[in-house]
A protein has these predicted regions:
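Short, well-ordered loop/turn and helix-capping segments at boundaries between secondary-structure elements
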Residues: 27-35, 82, 146
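Generic long, charged, amphipathic alpha-helical segments
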Residues: 41-100
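Active-site proximal loops enriched in glycine and acidic residues that flank catalytic Cys/His/Asp
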Residues: 19, 28-29, 60-65, 88-90, ...
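Single conserved hydrophobic/aromatic residue that forms the stacking wall/gate
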Residues: 1-6, 10
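C-terminal structured "cap/appendage" subdomains that terminate the fold
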Residues: 77-144
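Conserved phosphate/anionic-ligand binding catalytic regions in large, soluble enzymes, centered on
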Residues: 11-30
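Acidic, low-complexity intrinsically disordered tails
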Residues: 150-159
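Extended hydrophobic-aromatic, low-complexity segments
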Residues: 26-27, 36-40, 67-73, 86-89, ...
Length: 159
C-alpha cells in the first residue's frame, strides 16, 4: 500500500527461477565426462552417459576387414538397426575403435571375430568397465534392449 511517509521504502526484486533443457543437458554432459589413466599410462577419455540416454546405443565392430567378418557384422547391424541407434566401424585397430566409441559415449561395442563364424556368438564390451562377455547372436537383441531401457534406468534411480 502506498504511503507518503519517507521512512517507507519499497525494494523491488525479481526472482527468476528456471530450469531448461540446456542446463540439464550441460549437467549430464559435465557429470559424464571422465578421463581415466590406464595401467600402461595412457589416458582414456570416456563419456559415461547412462545407456538409456546415450544417443548411440551400440557399435558393431568386425575384428578385421577380411575373412567374412565384415559381412557377418553387417548382418548383425541389419538385425539391430531398426530398434537401436547403431554405428558400424571397421577403420583402424579394434583398440582404437573401442577408444573412439568410449569418447562419444557408446555404452556397448559388439565385436565380431573369427569364433563368431563358428559358434554364432559375439563379444559385448561394456564401456564403463571395459569387461567383455560372449553372448549368442540370438540373445543379443534382448540383452541390449534390457540394458538401454529407460524403464530400467528409472528403476535404478528410484531405488
Amino acid at each position: 500500500k502506498p504511503s507518503s511517509a519517507a521512512s517507507d521504502v519499497y525494494k523491488r526484486q525479481v526472482i527468476e527461477t528456471s530450469i531448461g533443457v540446456d542446463r540439464v543437458f550441460l549437467s549430464v554432459m559435465a557429470g559424464s565426462y571422465c578421463e581415466e589413466t590406464l595401467e600402461n599410462g595412457e589416458t582414456r577419455v570416456v563419456l559415461k552417459l547412462p545407456a538409456a540416454l546415450a544417443p548411440i546405443k551400440l557399435a558393431v565392430l568386425p575384428l578385421v576387414k577380411k575373412d567374412g567378418l565384415p559381412e557377418k557384422a553387417e548382418e548383425i547391424m541389419k538385425m539391430l538397426r531398426f530398434d537401436f541407434r547403431c554405428q558400424y566401424d571397421e577403420k583402424d585397430s579394434i583398440g582404437k575403435r573401442y577408444r573412439r566409441q568410449d569418447a562419444i559415449g557408446t555404452p556397448y561395442c559388439i565385436t565380431v571375430d573369427h569364433d563368431t563364424l563358428k559358434d554364432n556368438c559375439v563379444t559385448i564390451r561394456f564401456r564403463d568397465t571395459m569387461e567383455q562377455e560372449r553372448v549368442s547372436i540370438d540373445k543379443l537383441h534382448d540383452i541390449i534392449s534390457e540394458k538401454v531401457s529407460m524403464k530400467n534406468l528409472l528403476k535404478k534411480i528410484m531405488e
